[in-house]
Amino acid sequence: MSNMPDQRRGPWSAGEDQRLIKLVKDLGPGNWVNVARILGTRTPKQCRERWHQNLKPGLNHGPMTQEEAAIIVREVDLKGPRWADIARKLQGRSDNAVKNYWNGLNNRKKNQLRRQSAPRRVSASDVLRSSPGQLPRAHMQRPIRYPQDIYTGSRRPSSPSSFNDSLHHRVHESIEWFPSRPQQQQQQQQQQARCTTPFTSFYPPSHAFPTTDGYQDGSDGPTGSTLRLLTPPTSRRLAPFSTLPSPTTSSIGDLDEFDRRQLAAFAPPAAYRRPSLPFPQQSSMGYLPSATEYLPTAPSSPIALIQRDEKNHARIPVTSLLCS
């Protein structure tokens, strides 16, 4: 046993085949132990199988004929996979060749059944060449895939009426998100009322705040026609100069020269006067009047202002007027 060569795996080379044929001719086809010992690269079993399956004279390596295929099918149905017995009934066929043919035949049958059971794919050329009544049966019997319903989780509706009802429900629900035009206008009016109510309650329209940062009609100094008067942000208006509180006549004599010049600076010349406008109407936006709606007509002099206003207004010091 120590002289037995190690088993070598893999395909046989051409040199090994030539040496095996020569050794079998010299030693005989039954002395496989000595053949393997002399060959030195294969075991006795490998040498025997190689000779009977591939190198034996008289073996037919061509394709199987129809008569041979029928014999193989009949013998396998009767006896099962007894490849050596089946090979003896065939002239020049080895048991390994019979086994390989049977396995290949089974694989071809399985692939054919798999192709027949699979649905046929219809190409664009087949559709153009055939009429609507001649379409393949597999294409006509393909089930329709409905989109999954997000409400019920099902893909196929139970009936056409239920499908129409669910569609109508989705459309009606989507329309409810968009309010009608009268409802939208009413919501805008309520929102405008909420925005303007706090300012109008705290700041009446007649209240004004004199500033000296700019003047109407592009004037560059205190000699401009009108003093810019600021109101709350919701309604920028120019209040008439006559609405300002009037100083008392007793306080006129207490004014020094500086106060008199300051008071006279607020009286524009008569050339820049403009006629008073009536009470402003609501603008197109509903609550933002134009800045030119209140254009005052100032008196010609501070003395005339005092004489006119002391009859109608409360008497307050002039210093409070200048400080405000």
Swiss-Prot record:
Residues 155-165 have a biased composition (Polar residues). Keywords: DNA-binding, Nucleus, Repeat. InterPro entries: Homeodomain-like_sf, Myb_dom, MYB_TF, SANT/Myb. GO terms for biological process: mitotic cell cycle; positive regulation of transcription by RNA polymerase II. Residues 107-231 are annotated as: Disordered. GO terms for cellular component: nucleus. Gene3D superfamilies: Homeodomain-like. It is found in: Nucleus. Residues 166-175 have a biased composition (Basic and acidic residues). Transmembrane segments: none annotated. Its main location: nucleus. Residues 183-192, 222-231 have a biased composition (Low complexity). The keyword Nucleus applies. Residues 4-59, 60-110 form the HTH myb-type domain. It comes from the Eukaryota. GO terms for molecular function: DNA-binding transcription factor activity, RNA polymerase II-specific; RNA polymerase II cis-regulatory region sequence-specific DNA binding. The keyword Iron does not apply. It holds the Pfam family Myb_DNA-binding. This is Myb-like DNA-binding protein myb-1. The gene is rca-1.
